[in-house]
Every structure is written in C-alpha cells, then in structure tokens.
C-alpha cells in the first residue's frame, strides 16, 4: 500500500512538473538583490549599538546640503544625507546611520528606514570594498551580460548577492543603469565599465583586486558612445548652461 | 458654485464653497456603495488599492473615487459605478490582490468580517487563474496584544496611517517596494508603544493584524453585541461587549463622533481577559475571617446579620467607600443607607483625592465643553495632566488641533505644566512645580499674554493638580477666568473615575474626608489605604488585591454591568453626556448577589419599608459666578515647590481588572522596562 502511495505522489509530482507549476510552493522574498530584505538584519557589524557619527568634514557637507532646502522642509535633505552617510560608511548604511540622518532631518527614524529600503541604491547590509553591479536588463542581456555574470561568479568564486571572503568584492545583478549603447556593462562603486567581454572583465577585476588603476568607460577602442564611424553629429562645442552650479 | 452631476442616473448637486467632498463621499451620501480597502473616513486618503474606481464621462481613464474632489470639472458630468467597465476593473483589482493572499480563511480570525472576503464574493472573479508561486512574509510580533500575520496584508497602509497620524507613534512603516514590500517595524520585535494600538486591529481590512487575546476564540457571527462603556476613563467611551454563552469574547468600539469617533483604548479593549480569571479565583459565598488567611463560609442571612451588628453598634464609626464603577442607583441606595444610620461618612474612592468640593451647581463638576469641536481651539495649556496616559482619547483629539499656518513658525501653542510627555507639536514646557502654576494664576508668565491673545484657548486641568492645591474646582476656574480672560468653556477639568460626576449628582461627597473610623465598609473599592486604626473591614465586591489580608467580612457582589434593575442603566461622563449600558451577566455563582439587592435588603431591615426613591432633579442649572467670586479672595496656601507629578504611574496598572489581564500586564511591564520583546514570545502563547 505504501508503495502505491509513493507511486501516486511521484506521479502527482510529475504531473505538477509537466504542467509547469507547483501549487503548494510558497516563496520567501528574494535575497539576491542589492535591495536585500525589507527589514533590519541584526549582525555583528550592524546592530543597535554600532556607533555612527558624521566626520568633521562631512558635517560641513551636511550643513551645505541642509542649506539647499527651506528650514521647515528640511526633511527634503533625507536622500542626499543618506547618500553621504552611505559613502562615509563604506558603501552601506547602518541602522544607527539612518537614525542619525533622521535626527538631523527632524523626522522619525521609521521614515528614514522606509526611504532607505525603497531605493535599491542604498545598501542596508554590509558589503565588500568594491560593489560590482552587473546590468542584466534586456539590452545588456542581448549583448551577452549572461556571460559577464558567469565570468564574475567563477572568477570571484561567489554567487550573486555574496561577498568574497577577503571582503574585496560584492557581486549583484542590477537593472538598467542607462549605458545601454555600450552594452554589456557593469558598475563598480561609482564607475561604469562598458563594452565588456569575459577577458576584459577578468582583467578589470584583477586590476581592482591589486589596487591598480583601471580604464573607466568602454573597454574597447570606442570613445565614449561613438558609433563605428566615429563622431558624426554634434560636432560643434556644446552651448551652456551645462549643469546647475550648486550641484 | 453649485455643481450638478449625475451618479448612476441620480441627479445630485454639491455646493463647492460649502462642502469639500470627494466622489466617494458623494456616492455614499446618495446611497451608492463603492468598494474600498485603503479609504477610511477618519484617516487621510492614500489611494493605493484602486478598488474604488469609477467611470466619469469625458475622462480617459477610470478614476479612484476616494481621492478625487468634486470640483467644477464635474459639472454636467455623469458618474457611473455599475457599468461593465467598472465591474471588469474591480475584478481585475481583486485578482491582483488575491495573487499573493493566502487561502487560510478557515483558520483566520478575520473570517466573517473580512473586507477582502466580502468584496471577493461581491466583486471578484469566480475562478482564480494564478497557479504560480505565492509570496510569503514572515510573521511579525508587535507586542503581546497584536498578532501580525503579514502574509495576509494587502498593503492598504491604514495601520501605518493610523499610528502616525492619529496615535502619533512612528513604529510601523512601509518597507521595501514592489514584490518585497512589507508593512513592519524594520527592527525586529518592536512593540508598538501606543495606548491606542489595538485600533489597528479594527482598521485592518484583512486578517493581517488581529487581536492576540481573541486568537482562535470565536467567529463574529456567533457573537452577540451588548452595549457597554469604557469604565476606566472619564469620557465613558461607548463600547460593545461581544458575548457568547455568558462569556465576553472581545470588546469593540461603538462609534460616537462626540466622544471617541471610532477608537477605544487598549485598556478597555483587552481587559476582558480578567473576568475569566476573576471567575476562577474569586470567593463565591459570603465569608468571615477567623484567623489570618482562614475564612469560613456563611449564608447570606448570617452575613447580613453580622453586617448589621457592626453597623448598628453605637461604638463603631463606619466609613463607607464606594468604588469607581458603581452606578447611580447603587450610589443612591448606599447613601440612603448611611443617612438612615445617621452617618455622613460616605465617599467614592475618587472623591477621596479632593479636599473640598462644591457640588451645589452642576457647572462645578461637569464640563460645559463639547468634545465635538475640540479641535477648533488654537492654544492648549495642560496643567498637571499627562494626557497620553490619563485620557488617551482626548489626547488624540487634541493632537489634531488645527494650529493654522503659524505651526511652522516658532510660536508654541502648547504649554505644559507638570510632567513632560511627547506631543506631536513642539510644546512650551513651563515648569513642573506649583510655583509656575501660581505665577500663571497671577498673570506673571509671558504665556498668559499668549492665552489672552488667542481666540479659543483650551486649558486642561488634571487631577494631579487638583489634588495638590487646596482650591475647589470652581475656585480654580474662577481664578483662571480672571487671570487669563477666559470663559468657562475654555477650561476643561479632567477628573478620575467613571462615576465621579454621578456621585456628585447624588450628593455623595464629604468635605475633608479622611478615613478615621474603626470600621471600613468598602463597596468594590480597591484603591484605599487601610491603616492600622481600622479594626474591621467589610468588603463587598468582586476581588481585592490591595488589602485582601485585612478583610474581615467578605460579601460577594456582581460586576457593574450585571448590577441594575432594568435592562439598561445610564452613566454620565465628565461632559454631562449620557451613555447607556445594557445588562450582561457573566457571573456563574448563584450566591453572588447584586449590590443593589444587598442594599435594598439592608434598607428594608432598617425600617421594613420600601425605600422611596428620590431622584435629584436633573435640570440644567445655570447660575452666575457671583458666589464664587466671593470665595476667590481667600489666600492660596501651598508648598510652592511641590512638583505636579502624574497620578498614574503605569498606564497598565490602574484597575484591578487591568492588573489581572495577563497580556495588558506584560505589556505594561515591558514598556516600563523599555525592553525590546524577547523573540519567541509567541511560542509560549500557543497561538501559531
Ligand atoms: S496590516 Fe492590515 S491595515 Fe496594515 S497595511 Fe496590511 S492590510 Fe492594511
Ligand atoms: S540595459 Fe544594461 S545599461 Fe541599460
Ligand atoms: S479606496 Fe480608493 S484607492 Fe483605495
């Protein structure tokens, strides 16, 4: 009888598989993205007691950022301040850092948590020194980002969402970063590396690992986003104004 | 401009200048129901569930009715809520909501009163088309009172809006986005520190937030509603007891816009747990102490005989203390009893706090304000009251006071004398000692100028101030009125105890009362200090935890909601508003008698006659303040440096019923220790 039951269940399993679904399968929120979990994870280096304070020079910057907004709307400075805190903290933002920013903005800490967890560019868990973000959205995918991600995984010896044991690299997949013309691309910390191939990716990662200077931008001979014939339009120098001077 | 439009062929018109309403409100006013999840009358509009879509002619897309005001664009348009396009849209919204909603209705406590269930039935698709992975979210703990099964959450954000806007605590938030969006506290095991947190259980349209105390106990269709009141608060919030078979299963608010809107405090919402415990541990027969901790059971006949032996003994001096829950019928009976015995030593336990009181005029103990327009005030001064703890419902009303545009400027519209506590707006902290109070009386503080300037100030005087100053209420009022140019409506006096006003109505008060006799007759009163001078204590009530070992004669009586002659009894709150309560019986023992019954028997014994019931004429007496002004001249004698501390130390410890409710107690303790809850607290609760 037991055997027949076993048979039956395997049969059901096969049926489910052949239909392409499994009715009773529940899934936890995905863990692999840079947005990680929507809650605080208590770790040794990120808990209620991890101290955080802005450095002296960053405090000057804080003042500058706050000065951009009217006094009664100083919560508008929340995102720039979170960014500043993240930079100071080595690419990720700790619980206490969010509390600190919320305090400066005069809002409840909860609001800072909400904002930081909404935007995927804030990392709320500790990351490695170099944050490798490989774009896998359609244009990059068509130009071979799958290969790039595979290379990164095998070369660094980690999976997506993990950090290398020497704390040098954290690897994540991201959505379009806006450099599709030079796909495939990846972004390491603040710099874009475009027109990648497996070989140039390995080369880049090695250079970064050994603290050697890297070539930012396209890794081929292409200049900026020019086509194969070189520059054909916009030949005259740009007319101003180019950028807001307070940025 | 008058806007004329049609809703489903019904002609409607709205005066734009006078009314500021949305499409949804207009539809509801015309009897057309629009399904909704995120919209709630008392909260701000979020517009994130899209269930309320309606069709408006000349609009390209369907509109979310809850968030769109009716303005001149709607003139001559027609709004459709039942056409096929709308039905289709609703089906779509429902389908999306149900993608990730678990199918655990049979074990869900919200079953039967779940908006999602009902609306799926009415507007949903009859079959599901999603056989893909369902998302699951971990169970969250928000304290001992609220259970959070967040997989069921549909992200309407009502709970978040209630806590931030109304309760004023920012402990819940919307975290993450898209597929990963969760409602939560971000940090683990954070307790929601609000006296009103239980209301998010009612607000949650699905079973994501449910009561931990009511978990797996009952189904809404088996429960019967019985009207009651919140006995722990002077506002006497109307509530509903939900009962089944002589047991209270849960307590829900009754809506009253003049008092509580839709909210009730956690205290009353969860205190019913104690009745069950009381039922188990109380004595059910009259008993007499022969030695310490040794009681013998008596029959009622002998017990009453013993009472009379004590009461009629000329050598004894009897003090009668009446608890704060006793209704006015009983107050009358026991006052009569004491009068017949030729004694005037009677008082309610809250009356004990006050040295002097003039209860000739109703104005002296009942506030003439109306809570309905309390938010029209433009300045609030709190004297010796921690509103958050002492009257949470009044607190949330005042938190929404509209302070106009200068809220942003540094004019501080809230002054606090007494203990500091958190408020939404920045407040000016004037001082903690009586000295600052006196300065205010004399008009020496700069704050007085502000009070004079403001159009509708509100001064709230709390019991802790009243008990520390040898002024009667009316004197206090008169002084305030003189010092700051106020009218009586501008002063709000908050006392304690549910029946304080009613006791004064019956004239049950004695000036400068102190327990001096050798016999104490306590009717359901726990909060009395029993000194060594007292050598005989009669306790007639339910259960006592303060002077249990001193009781000599114990007479079991019923709870306040079981104890009246007819089906209903009326209680009066500090604003003179009356709330009706209905009879509810939960006591099992048949030897437990009503207080009124015991009182009548005693009276009959006294002169074998039916008691003639004198009702004090309940007319509104409006008298000038001339008499009071005479008294005003007396000097105020106080210790200037006394601080005005709060009377209530721990919100969760004020009453025997609350002290016996396990979950409330633990909440109180946890909050006191400011301890983050330990993980795994659910495991010992056998809930999940
Ligand atoms: S927990 Fe309930 S009230 Fe809160 S967002 Fe979810 S469904 Fe709405
Ligand atoms: S798709 Fe990769 S950068 Fe746009
Ligand atoms: S009720 Fe209108 S969007 Fe939710």
UniProtKB/Swiss-Prot annotation, chain A:
What the entry lists under PROSITE patterns is as follows:
COMPLEX1_24K
- Cofactor(s) recorded in Swiss-Prot or TrEMBL: [2Fe-2S] cluster
The EC designation for this entry is 7.1.1.2
Among Gene3D superfamilies, the record links this protein to: Glutaredoxin, NADH-quinone oxidoreductase subunit E
- Region of interest (Disordered), residue spans: 211-247
Which Pfam family is one of this chain's hits? 2Fe-2S_thioredx
Recite the UniProt cofactor note for this protein.
Binds 1 [2Fe-2S] cluster.
Main localization is: mitochondrion
Gene Ontology CC annotation, any one = mitochondrial inner membrane
MF terms (GO), sorted A to Z = 2 iron, 2 sulfur cluster binding; metal ion binding; NADH dehydrogenase (ubiquinone) activity
**Is Iron-sulfur one of the keywords UniProt gives this record?**
yes
Sites where the protein binds [2Fe-2S] cluster: 135, 140, 176, 180
The reaction(s) annotated as catalysed by this protein in its Swiss-Prot or TrEMBL entry are: a ubiquinone + NADH + 5 H(+)(in) = a ubiquinol + NAD(+) + 4 H(+)(out)
Q: Which biological process terms from the Gene Ontology are attached to this UniProt entry?
A: mitochondrial electron transport, NADH to ubiquinone
CDD domains according to UniProt: TRX_Fd_NuoE
Q: Which family does it belong to?
A: Belongs to the complex I 24 kDa subunit family.
What role does it play? Core subunit of the mitochondrial membrane respiratory chain NADH dehydrogenase (Complex I) that is believed to belong to the minimal assembly required for catalysis. Complex I functions in the transfer of electrons from NADH to the respiratory chain. The immediate electron acceptor for the enzyme is believed to be ubiquinone.
Quaternary structure, per UniProt, is: Complex I is composed of 45 different subunits. This is a component of the flavoprotein-sulfur (FP) fragment of the enzyme.
Q: What is this protein called?
A: NADH dehydrogenase [ubiquinone] flavoprotein 2, mitochondrial
Protein species of origin: Dictyostelium discoideum (Social amoeba)
Source taxonomy = Eukaryota, Amoebozoa, Evosea, Eumycetozoa, Dictyostelia
From Swiss-Prot, chain B:
Cofactor stoichiometry and binding remark: Binds 1 [2Fe-2S] cluster per subunit.
Its cofactor is: [2Fe-2S] cluster; [4Fe-4S] cluster
Predominant cellular place of this UniProt entry's protein: mitochondrion
Q: What residue stretches are annotated with the 4Fe-4S His(Cys)3-ligated-type domain?
A: 85-124
Q: 4Fe-4S Mo/W bis-MGD-type domain: which residues? A: 223-279
Q: Which UniProt keywords apply?
A: 2Fe-2S, 4Fe-4S, Electron transport, Iron, Iron-sulfur, Membrane, Metal-binding, Mitochondrion, Mitochondrion inner membrane, NAD, Oxidoreductase, Respiratory chain, Translocase, Transport, Ubiquinone
Matches recorded under SMART domains: NADH-G_4Fe-4S_3
A biological process (GO) of this protein is: ATP synthesis coupled electron transport
The UniProt entry, under InterPro entries, shows: 2Fe-2S_ferredoxin-like_sf (IPR036010), 2Fe-2S_ferredoxin-type (IPR001041), Mopterin_OxRdtase (IPR006656), Mopterin_OxRdtase_4Fe-4S_dom (IPR006963), NADH_UbQ_OxRdtase_75kDa_su_CS (IPR000283), NADH_UbQ_OxRdtase_ferredoxin (IPR054351), NADH_UbQ_OxRdtase_Gsu (IPR010228), NADH_UbQ_OxRdtase_Gsu_4Fe4S-bd (IPR019574)
Among the GO molecular function terms of this UniProt record, one is: NADH dehydrogenase (ubiquinone) activity
Name the residues that bind [4Fe-4S] cluster 2.
Answer: 153, 156, 159, 204
Gene Ontology cellular component terms for the protein in this record: mitochondrial inner membrane
Q: Which domain of life is it from?
A: Eukaryota
Show the catalytic activity: a ubiquinone + NADH + 5 H(+)(in) = a ubiquinol + NAD(+) + 4 H(+)(out)
List locations, semicolon-separated. Answer: Mitochondrion inner membrane
Which residues does the record give as [4Fe-4S] cluster 1 binding sites? 101, 105, 108, 114
Q: Which CDD domains match?
A: fer2, MopB_Res-Cmplx1_Nad11-M
EC numbers listed for it are 7.1.1.2
Report the residue ranges that make up the 2Fe-2S ferredoxin-type domain in this protein: 1-85
The function of this protein is: Core subunit of the mitochondrial membrane respiratory chain NADH dehydrogenase (Complex I) that is believed to belong to the minimal assembly required for catalysis. Complex I functions in the transfer of electrons from NADH to the respiratory chain. The immediate electron acceptor for the enzyme is believed to be ubiquinone. This is the largest subunit of complex I and it is a component of the iron-sulfur (IP) fragment of the enzyme. It may form part of the active site crevice where NADH is oxidized.
What's the family?
Answer: Belongs to the complex I 75 kDa subunit family.
What quaternary structure, including any partners, is listed in this protein's UniProt entry?
Complex I is composed of about 45 different subunits.
NCBIfam families named among the record's database cross-references? NuoG
PANTHER family recorded: NADH-UBIQUINONE OXIDOREDUCTASE 75 KDA SUBUNIT, MITOCHONDRIAL, RESPIRATORY NITRATE REDUCTASE
Record's protein name:
NADH-ubiquinone oxidoreductase 75 kDa subunit
Question: What species does this protein belong to?
Answer: Dictyostelium discoideum
Write the lineage as a comma-separated list.
Answer: Eukaryota, Amoebozoa, Evosea, Eumycetozoa, Dictyostelia
